């Protein structure tokens, strides 16, 4: 008889839940709920389990916020809870709450070739560190290493490191944003809101007033080639994505590959392919040759957060991935 566990991927707006076959890791019965419609994550879980008529003992839910102890307070939502209390209330034997990019990193060993698009470099080296990052509402970062037949995710808040410009245009962006917001992290330029920041800074650098555009508007105008400022912003976004990925590669020697997740890049995939992304990735001066062979992949799996939550839980329960 198939034994299932509950897996989840929760962001600031939606909560996506599914079942994971503990033996195979297969994800099924995925359903998305609006977080605004429920008073707590526990309430969403109860609705999901009731709707699907299943009883589970184990669960792993990825959440887009730092996980530092038993108490979880979401960054972009009002939900806050004790992991131990939620586990007790649901009657689970095992419940883990993990960072969303911990889940994405743990999905990487489970991905197949059709789930990936490669951007330069050679083949990944088995056993070497892996980096994963992605721009969405924010900028998520994690690393993954393989030790003693176990995958170990190394989460953190790498999206909040300093934005490090390496061209006159990027230095201009930093100067304008610093005057507006003070500290300028990488996330301030590599995210949906970050794309807006890039556009606004480009326009303001020419002593003009920027329009009140959303990330979607900027992307659409750039792809339609109807706004030179939007096209410059999107082009610069791609280059800075490359620079940041190259920084991750240097920091951990990620010869196992660098992986891009998140919801932004797939929206302008052809533009990204033709952009200066790989040039930015390899623009490391004396260490250009060091990163030249490191492959970069875009993850195109529909639910890497769910897949990775399941992988994390299965490994915790003793399965070898």
Swiss-Prot record:
GO cellular component: cytosol
Keyword terms: ATP-binding, Cytoplasm, Glycolysis, Kinase, Nucleotide-binding, Transferase
Family matches, as Pfam families: Glucokinase
Residues binding ATP: 8-13
Superkingdom: Bacteria
Subcellular location: Cytoplasm
Molecular function GO labels: ATP binding; D-glucose binding; glucokinase activity
Keyword Oxidoreductase part of the UniProt annotation: no
InterPro entries membership: ATPase_NBD (IPR043129), Bacterial_glucokinase (IPR050201), Glucokinase (IPR003836)
Enzyme class: transferase
Family classification: Belongs to the bacterial glucokinase family.
Protein name per its UniProtKB record: Glucokinase
């Amino acid at each position: 008889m198939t034994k299932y566990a509950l897996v989840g991927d929760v962001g600031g707006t939606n909560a996506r839940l599914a079942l994971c076959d503990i033996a195979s890791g297969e994800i099924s019965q995925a359903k998305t709920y609006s977080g605004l419609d429920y008073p707590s994550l526990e309430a969403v879980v109860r609705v999901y389990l009731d709707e699907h008529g299943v009883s589970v003992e184990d669960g792993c839910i990825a959440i887009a916020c730092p996980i530092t102890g038993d108490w979880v307070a979401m960054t972009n939502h009002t939900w806050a809870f004790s992991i131990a209390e939620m586990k007790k209330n649901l009657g689970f034997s095992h419940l883990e709450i993990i960072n969303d990019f911990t889940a994405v990193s743990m999905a990487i060993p489970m991905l197949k070739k059709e789930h990936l698009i490669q951007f330069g470099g050679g083949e990944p080296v088995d056993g070497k560190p892996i980096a994963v990052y992605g721009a969405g509402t924010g900028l998520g970062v994690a690393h993954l290493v393989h030790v003693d037949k176990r995958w170990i995710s190394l989460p953190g808040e790498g999206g909040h490191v300093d934005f490090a410009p390496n061209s006159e245009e990027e230095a201009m962006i930093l100067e304008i944003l610093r005057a507006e917001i003070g500290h300028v992290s990488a996330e301030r330029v590599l995210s949906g809101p970050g794309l807006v920041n890039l556009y606004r800074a480009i326009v303001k650098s020419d002593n003009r007033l920027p329009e009140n555009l959303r990330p979607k508007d900027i992307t659409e105008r750039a792809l339609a080639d109807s706004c030179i400022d939007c096209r410059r912003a999107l082009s610069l976004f791609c280059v800075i994505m490359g620079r940041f990925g190259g920084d991750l590669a240097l920091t951990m020697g990620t010869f196992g590959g660098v992986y891009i997740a998140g919801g932004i890049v797939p929206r302008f995939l052809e533009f990204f392919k033709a952009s200066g992304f790989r040039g930015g990735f390899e623009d490391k001066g004396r260490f250009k040759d060091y990163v030249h062979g490191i492959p970069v992949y875009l993850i195109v799996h529909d639910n890497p957060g769910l897949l990775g939550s399941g992988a994390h839980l299965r490994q915790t329960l003793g399965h070898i991935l």
